[in-house]
Amino acid sequence: MKFRDYLKDNKVSHWRDKYIDYEYLKNLIDNEYINAEILNSAIIDLPLSPEEQNNINKNNNNNNNNNNNNNNNNNNNNNINNNNNNNNTLKDGEQTNSNNISIPNQMAPQESSGEDEDDENENGNGVVGDEDGGDDDEIEMDELVIDDNGEIINITATAGSRVKVKKGINKGVKRLKKIAKNTNNRLSRMVSRSPKNKGLGSSSEIEGDEFQLDGGGISSQIEMVASNNITGATVFVPQETFQDGFIDQVNKVDIFFVDRYRKTKFKCVDLVGMIPFLSDNEQLRTIRNIDYVKQGFHDNYHYLESLESYKNLNLDGFYKILDKYEKINPRIAKECRKYLENTRLTSTNSPVRELSRRIKQIYARYFTGNDIKLANNQIRTNKQVNQFQNYIIGFLIGASAILIAQVIFKFYYYFPDVADSPKNSPMAWLLFRISSLPIILGTLFALMTKLWEKAGINYVFIFELKPDIKRSSSRYLMYGMIFVTMWLVVFNVYVDSISNKTGSPETSRYLLLIPLLFILGSIFFLILPFKVLAHRTRFWVLHKMSKVVQAPFVPVRFPDFFMSVQLLCLGEFLFNMQQIVCMFKFNDPLYSPSGVCFKHKAVIFPILSVLPFYWRVMQCVRRFWETGQFFPHITSAIRSTFSIVTNILLWVANNYGNKEWSWIKILWFIINVVGTVYKLYADFTVDWGLFLNYKTNKQWPLREKMVFKRKWVYYVAMSFDTFFRFVWLIVFSIRQGTSYKLDHPLFLFWFSLSEIAWAAQFIFFRVESEHVQCADTYSHFKDIPLPFSQDYKNYMEEKKSRYDEKKPHHHHHHDNNNNETKDGSGGTHHRRNLSNGHHPYDDDDDDESIDSDADSKDLNLESNSEFVDDEGYNQRKNSIISSIKKIASTQELNSMNRISSHPDLYSTMQRFAGHVPDSNSSMPRMYSHPDFNHPIPRVLTSHVEVNPSTLRTVPQHRLNNIPNQRIISHADINPQHLRVGSPRVEFNSTVQQRSPHGEIQSSMIRNHSRADLNSSMQRIQSHPELNSSNRNQVDPNSPMNRLITRADLNKSR
């Protein structure tokens, strides 16, 4: 099993947002592979022509013999350079913004033969470089003045009489820019090709150029976009690193863990203080108060167990994610592991376990007579109760399925034709239908509580239920299934009774008492005033129903709104109840359209139908008066107002309309359609936030906060909501278009059931919406009110005052074997084990006694292993964080391997970029990299940079269809990528393809011998300015003198 699935299955629902975000950290690790490729600029390699390569090899072989002499010259010049180092060395950062850019002529195009030049013009390979016929024994220095558009406006000689200005410099620079632009355009076309054209072919030629780009297709995470300027200001968007995300996650878990522990300990201290309080107050030592203290110890012990499991689960996740990251970056992973081990999550002596042990000892000391085994059995979670309830639920579901099948079989067996059924059967169907609606609604609510618990929705907090009472969704569902089974049993009895056709009509008439007695019995059970049969739930329902009736004169809370919605869907129940009263009053039990009650035009009928909607409107008005918010309170009021108007118009049309389509009925139809559309729109916006907050909502078109991550759940719910809202229109169309009036009892039952289903779905998602819209819902909690709060407060104040007086105190020593207490004077007295014997009843078989002589030493919860937040702890954390940042910054320098910001090197790059780079770009940040301490020609002849501002991200669906090859967008200029033997300026290649074994192999990197470097070095070292004999002739202000006087440039290669 994968850890993310294990984490999901073992989360505590109320702490769901407080766990490690494992997927988030894993994504940060995955981004490490991509960041090395897309953070910086792309560098493209332009291969040399065969003639140029042969010339370079020839020059390298000829210059090998002169290397030793050049090295000796370097050694002789070291002393002179060292003496003048302080005066002639140019500091880093000087002249970086100058428009006069001084560069070695090695970077400039040199004179070549006409034949070679023509070839270059034809092939597009006119990269500025050292051609055949160039002198290897001298270096020319040119100063180029470049304007903002990259055009050369002035060329002057600054290196003395031996400096020679090359004729083709302007032409060569323009040709270089043209090649770069063509390369960029070609790459754009290659990336943006259709996925069907997978193969570009290894011999793909760039149009108008002779060089080739290897690859059989490009899989890239960048898009080289053609633009007027291939280079521009570099803008880097900072991305969150793994170490930052890891530290944030560790801090989140650590703070939540310690905070919850301290809150639990504070509650335990209060419970411990109640033990001597109850011991000293015999009047308050009741079963209820003792149960309160015992239950408090139970709950806190279980809470600490959950907290310990929370810690262990998060630690497993952190260690697993570190094991993954260690394969990529072991140094930072080691520091992150050190940071984790320095937190309070990895404390050796866990205060949580110590507090759990102390709670168990105190519980055994004062409630089980020092019986640790009995205390363990009483204080641990009793899972057998839930298992028993689940067994009962399964048994009742099976019994209900059998009863339903039996009812259907018997009815159609005894009455194959509906006309053969008893004359009073419509009345019986009515009675059974209206009695089943509240039962089904209550059972659906029990099922919803189970789903809310699974989804982590805190319905106890939303419904404002008392937190000191244990609730179980399985228990609710068990009660619901009991009523469903009883209803089916009564229904079976009625079907068996009416199937006896030998009975007289009077006898069959009395059979109506069967469903009627069941309804009366259910109502009596609901209002039963005794504390039996789920009395808390029954009293809560009656209390909320009374508050609905009192609206708008009482404050309205969410439970009151919930109860009003239940009454809305029970409108059919209220309407049928008034008809039952009418039938018994007029002795018309046939329940037919020709009966008295159907023809009766009592005004009470529409009033009872619209009464639930009126209560709902009054609740909305009250909420608007309290909050002043038009949405959603007045919005909901308008919904209910539509229902009131349509019900009144329907009653008027049925009783006073002369025609089938009178103007009243037409008005009713129009208002009903408009009202249904408005209700549907209100449902979508209030419950699901559909099409709201387009600019700021990341989850658009749904609301931003959702409990269920699968969006299809909400869309399915919207579909059902639309169907339930327009059921009336379907029924109306069938009745108007056909002769069938849809008055069959079974159809009416399903029609009523659709109202129940709508109400259940509406409440389910409204509670879910209320849950996610509460700020920090999981941190909201209600403290359990003390049953003796004022008395306990007075007792603690008196105890504190006695402590402040510092009276002499005798230490008592307990003898657990003989229940005697020895005081300081040597006398003894017996402890009083007060029980609840003075009460005329006992609740359970458990020992309800509490030790009346509580010892303060036994009740001490302090221990040596406590969580600390001292200055030393914070300093250790900050020290590790600083170490992680230092290592990360060092690795960033080593990974990019870019050109340093030495003024002359930086100016060289500016010459070919045609602009002054942004101060935030990566190049000015790269100072004093070890690779830059080598002789300058090694870097100057290596590459020119393509600006990252021309890079764009390719959509993921396009990347998935472009296989095999990748354009790396990072300019990893390390020595193995540099073409140090070429005196030309080139685009260095990091176009790479993945081998079958997963290793990245460079397709265009050329390994040159050491002679390549020596060849370039010889050209610099053989320059007269470098010669000691001509040292005095060199202008001290020349750029070349500033370079070669640095000690590190004169070191032997």
From Swiss-Prot:
PROSITE patterns: EXS (PS51380), SPX (PS51382). The keyword Secreted does not apply. GO terms for molecular function: inositol hexakisphosphate binding; phosphate transmembrane transporter activity. It is found in: Membrane. It holds the Pfam family EXS. It is a multi-pass membrane protein. Residues 95-112, 1023-1040 have a biased composition (Polar residues). This is SPX and EXS domain-containing protein 2. One of its GO terms (cellular component) is plasma membrane. Residues 1-339 form the SPX domain. Residues 596-798 form the EXS domain.
